[in-house]
A protein has these predicted regions:
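Face-selective signature of the C-terminal outer-membrane beta-barrel domain
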Residues: 180-203, 236-355
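Membrane-embedded beta-barrel scaffold of Gram-negative outer-membrane proteins
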Residues: 185-187, 193-199, 203-209, 371, ...
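Acidic/polar loop-and-plug regions of large Gram-negative outer-membrane beta-barrel proteins
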Residues: 99-103, 116-187, 202-247, 292-318, ...
Length: 599
């Protein structure tokens, strides 16, 4: 979500949804657990809400920074805000930046430009208006599309230099992002406020890419495709694709929230509605890659001629509509006891080139919070799950949305006016219609794998987090999660995802030298695996448990000028981020230094 408005994307086409530059946002909010009351489509894991930067200063202020790092990274950011009227009731802010970097991957280069302009205005004592425009362009040369072949035909595993890439130098992946947005807030009746958020966004992309998906013959390095036993023409070992398209989103969310009195007690109420329309239109031209075109993979270095492309044809033209009405109230049953109940009604419809699908769903929510004392509280909550998905069945149709229930029981504490908080929670998630790969390509597709819906998936676990100030000079965030997920026959679901994770980040300002701050972080995850059924037997891909250690130091040279150094993957750990039939290595050790000036 961005400013509370959700965006749903088609994972078959890489539109760069994860590439929005963080310099454009003030903060990132993470809401754990099913979130259908917020978004209309409840994801059982979490929702990330990106909050845009706004013009809040009534005087001219700004920040400029320059960063240099490994793989020829250079990055420059300017963030300026100023009053636009003498009384400061109308203010403006612009954020602009440029980044260029190579990679540990051979031939890879990325260039990014971004800009955001926003005007915030106080139209009176009770009315405010925000309006803005955002632009990003990302050009990537020699991007990877998938990974490196993991398996030899005898079941043994391959290993490669982390710099190895299958991408030829003619491949690219370019994207343009344009967004306009507006927010109006109206306060009335003392404790009440109405808010309207609206946005229009367009994303365009154009790419020519290549992938390799095959097994390696150890004798000579030749490649053998995974689908050759399906008949003539299926012996390909990869493919090239010229893909382009556009996604347009129009969305509006209108809600009011405030307090009301009932039975001598003060309560809170929120009422709202939302509408969104999203169109995804993509065109493509594909060609299969056969073993003789690559030769021995042992000597292949990305020297592959560009495809003689056929004209593009329409591959997808889908329009998704979502209409929602929602309400929630926080009822004060007693001084220490609060009941939160709510529901969201959603009408969701998708129209494709060949068929339509429509779902109506009511997402209820109920929670009970008990304040044990000034610092401790306990809670219990329930909500349902309704999550449209973009996986296709064997006939090429979308699977029905995931449905289910989410239960949670927790204990929270709050210390020193929220400077330090802790959370302990246990949860249980029940889901139906969960997509599971069949490993079989969809007939007539460009290699898309068919999925089937699986009912009776159950996940249960526990998580703990402590976040905030341990002392005036010491900040720490520590979190740990453990869960299990099984289907209705007791088999592990998505064992390629870590069941146990531990995250620690800390920073310390030296009392004897307050200009100097040092810190670091550790991310640890347990062993993961994935079984792949191949023509040569069932092969298991595994990644053992590992920890990544990062360090940083910041020195405040003057009141306005600071320098920070970052060292990522301190021990240069080699690890695999893609536990299936291909290998995708994670980022090796790298360093960067950033100089920042505030005024």
């Amino acid at each position: 979500m961005v400013d509370g408005i959700p965006t749903y994307f088609e994972s078959r086409w890489n539109l760069g949804d994860a590439l929005s530059d963080t310099a454009l946002f003030e903060r990132v909010e993470v809401v754990r657990g099913a979130n259908g009351l917020m978004t209309g489509t409840g994801n059982p894991s979490a929702t990330i809400n990106m909050i845009r930067k706004h013009a809040t200063s009534r005087e001219f202020t700004g920040n400029v920074s320059a960063e240099y790092g490994s793989w020829n990274k250079q990055r420059y950011v300017t963030d300026l805000q100023s009053p636009l009227t003498a009384d400061g009731n109308v203010r403006g802010r612009i954020v602009a930046g440029y980044q260029n970097n190579d990679s540990w991957l051979d031939r890879y280069n990325s260039e990014k430009m971004f800009f955001s302009g926003i005007v915030d205005a106080d139209l009176g004592d009770t009315t405010s208006l925000s309006a803005g425009y955002e632009y990003q362009r990302i050009d990537i040369n020699s991007p990877t599309w998938g990974g490196l072949p993991r398996w030899n035909t005898d079941g043994s595993k391959n290993s490669y230099d982390r710099s190895r890439s299958t991408a030829p130098d003619w491949t690219y992946n370019d994207k343009d992002f344009n967004k306009v947005f507006v927010t109006i807030k109206q306060r009335f009746a003392d404790t009440w406020q109405a808010t309207m958020n609206a946005t229009h966004s367009e994303v365009k992309f154009d790419s020519k890419m290549m992938y390799v998906d095959a097994y390696v013959n150890k004798a000579d390095g030749t490649l053998i495709g995974p689908y050759g036993n399906y008949g003539p023409g299926y012996d390909y070992v990869g493919g090239t694709g010229w893909n382009s398209g556009k996604r347009k989103v129009d969305a509006v969310d209108l809600f009011a929230d405030g307090g009301y009195d009932l039975f001598g007690r003060q309560h809170n109420l929120m009422l709202g509605g939302s509408y969104s329309k999203q169109n995804n239109r993509y065109e493509s031209s594909w060609a299969n890659v056969f073993p003789n075109e690559i030769g021995s993979f042992y000597t292949y270095d990305g020297n592959f001629p560009e495809t003689n492309w056929n004209p593009q044809s329409l591959a997808q033209d889908d329009t998704t509509h979502m209409k929602s009405l929602y309400a929630a109230t926080r009822i004060s049953l007693a001084d220490p006891l609060h009941l939160i109940v709510g529901a969201r009604y959603t009408n969701w419809r998708i129209d494709t080139l060949t068929y339509s699908m429509e779902q109506n769903h009511t997402t209820p929510y109920a929670g009970l919070v008990y304040d044990i004392d000034d610092n401790w509280s306990t809670y219990a909550s329930y909500t349902s799950i309704f999550q449209p998905q973009n996986k296709l069945d064997s006939s090429g149709k979308y699977l029905s949305p995931i449905t289910g229930n989410n239960y949670e029981l927790g204990l929270k504490s709050d210390w020193m006016n929220s400077r330090l908080t802790t959370t302990l929670a246990v949860f249980r998630i029940e889901q139906d219609n969960v997509a599971q790969s069949t490993g079989v390509p969809i007939a007539g597709s460009n290699g898309d794998t068919a999925f089937k819906a699986m009912d009776g998936t159950v996940s249960k676990g526990v998580e703990f987090e402590i976040n905030g100030a341990i002392t005036d000079n010491w900040q720490m965030t520590f979190g740990a999660t453990r869960y299990v997920a099984e289907d209705n026959e007791g088999n592990a679901v998505n064992p390629n995802l870590p069941r146990t994770t531990v995250k620690l980040f800390t920073r310390y300002r030296l009392p004897a030298m307050p200009e100097l701050t040092v810190g670091g972080g550790v991310n640890w995850q347990n062993h993961v695996y994935s079984d792949t059924v191949t023509p040569y037997g069932t092969f298991r891909a595994e990644q053992g448990s590992y920890a990544l250690v990062d360090l940083f130091t910041r020195y405040q040279v003057t009141k306005n000028f600071s320098v920070q150094g970052n060292l990522n993957n301190l021990f240069d750990k080699t690890y695999d981020t893609n536990i299936d039939g291909s290998i995708v290595y994670g980022e090796p050790r790298n360093v960067s230094i950033t100089a920042s000036y505030q005024f």
